[in-house]
């Protein structure tokens, strides 16, 4: 259970975060108690079905207890699997992640404020829902679009899918999170914010969200939250300047071919103008204070870094056609140098290298960047042709002398491939 999809942690708007932590701990304890009770009932049924009693039953129970102890000792992560208490810092991090999702329109904040009743528990034998519980949905149960949200929805949604760490911008990540906290806690939002800082051990929430040269804490925790085994799939991407002093946050499910262009025209270029004007103003002063000298140095660095970021994103935008079917790592790979968290940057850099080498030519992104290489491969690999929708153009089903059907490339497949390549490179 996490607060990311279950707003129970925030279901009492007038309560403190500590009250929420205590409430969540009680839920965990109750869940463990119910699980233990159910397990005991299952064990009793199994013993009865197999006619196990006395010494046989005692031997099995001793063996199970021994296995459990060995599993605990051999836990590779060294983590306690007993979830009878809640971690305040972890829950606070999940709450803030929830608020970011609210700003992007991922989560329906009305569940957290109590305006809407919590979704019913699903039947275990029902088909999996299209959306996670608590998501902002349309009438068909799909993620809501701008024209599918009630006019009276209580908070503004950043439909463009871009937020920014910039106190002067209306899409400032910190301010959008604070809007969500204010909607949930009203006049108590200030004390809730301070309590969150205390739990997280940070001076301010802006510091918590900020990306540094080597990455920031929020994204590190977000990445961990959306990682399982070897699969890493963060939803909120920090795209930063080299020093991390300016960061755009992209919402993965809403990426499009226009995203990077929007990032440049709506965020980076206005910021460039602002910083350049401030730099010129400070530089023109005859006598500056130490604070102004420091501000001038910062502005000089930011002018250069924003120009580099703008140029890089426009270059990537020319070939970047994100397709969610490719998955997070492949989609994010071209942007690897703009992530500051080193382990994630390395993962994406390695992925980009494999994309360049043709290891992932099944991906839509590979097809859009290297159409000649990928389409030529489709002549020899029908599964690849199917993946890119070229199977009917390049392959035909034939019948041999024995009447057995088989697939083979069309006689004019090379010419067709050249035509397909020319269409992709126009």
Give each language-model segment a name.
Residues 1-47, 268, 279-280:
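Extended amphipathic alpha-helical segments enriched in small hydrophobics
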Residues 2-4, 10, 19-22, 29-33, ...:
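General structural signal for secondary-structure boundaries
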Residues 50:
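Active-site-proximal loop/hinge segments that shape catalytic or ion-binding/gating pockets
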Residues 55-426:
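Terminal accessory regions of large proteins
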């Amino acid at each position: 259970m996490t607060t990311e999809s279950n707003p129970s942690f925030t279901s009492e708007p007038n309560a403190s975060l500590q009250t929420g932590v205590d409430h969540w701990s009680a839920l965990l304890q109750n869940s463990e108690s119910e699980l233990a009770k159910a397990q005991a009932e299952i064990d009793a049924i199994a013993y009865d079905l197999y006619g196990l009693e006395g010494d046989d039953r005692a031997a099995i129970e001793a063996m199970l207890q021994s296995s459990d102890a060995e599993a605990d000792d051999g836990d590779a992560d060294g983590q306690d699997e007993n979830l009878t208490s809640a971690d305040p810092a972890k829950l606070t991090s999940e709450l803030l992640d929830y608020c970011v999702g609210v700003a992007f329109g991922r989560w329906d904040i009305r569940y957290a404020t109590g305006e809407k009743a919590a979704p019913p528990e699903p039947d275990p034998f029902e088909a999996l829902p299209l959306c996670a519980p608590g998501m902002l949905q349309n009438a068909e149960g799909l993620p809501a679009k701008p024209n599918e949200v009630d006019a009276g929805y209580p908070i503004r949604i950043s439909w463009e899918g871009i937020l920014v760490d910039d106190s002067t911008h209306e899409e400032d990540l910190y301010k959008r999170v604070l809007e969500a906290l204010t909607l949930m806690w009203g006049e108590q939002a200030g004390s809730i914010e301070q309590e969150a800082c205390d739990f997280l051990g940070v001076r301010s929430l802006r510091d918590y969200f900020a990306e540094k040269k080597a990455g920031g804490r929020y994204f590190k925790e977000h990445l961990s939250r959306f990682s399982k085994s070897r699969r890493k799939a963060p939803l909120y991407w920090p795209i930063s300047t080299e020093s991390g002093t300016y960061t755009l946050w992209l919402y993965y499910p809403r990426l499009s071919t226009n995203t990077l262009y929007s990032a440049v025209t709506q965020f980076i270029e206005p910021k460039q103008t602002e910083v350049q004007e401030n730099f010129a103003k400070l530089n023109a002063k005859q006598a500056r204070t130490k604070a102004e000298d420091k501000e001038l140095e910062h502005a000089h660095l930011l002018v250069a870094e924003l120009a580099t970021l703008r140029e890089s994103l426009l270059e990537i935008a020319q070939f970047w056609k994100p397709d969610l079917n490719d998955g997070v790592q492949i989609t994010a790979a071209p942007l690897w140098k703009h992530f500051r968290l080193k382990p994630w940057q390395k993962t994406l850099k390695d992925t980009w290298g494999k994309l360049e080498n043709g290891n992932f030519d099944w991906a839509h992104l590979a097809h859009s960047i290297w159409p000649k290489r990928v389409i030529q491969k489709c002549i020899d690999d029908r599964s690849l042709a199917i993946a890119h929708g070229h199977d009917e153009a390049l392959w035909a089903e034939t019948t041999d002398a024995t009447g057995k059907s088989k697939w083979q490339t069309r006689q004019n497949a090379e010419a067709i491939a050249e035509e397909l390549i020319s269409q992709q490179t126009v």
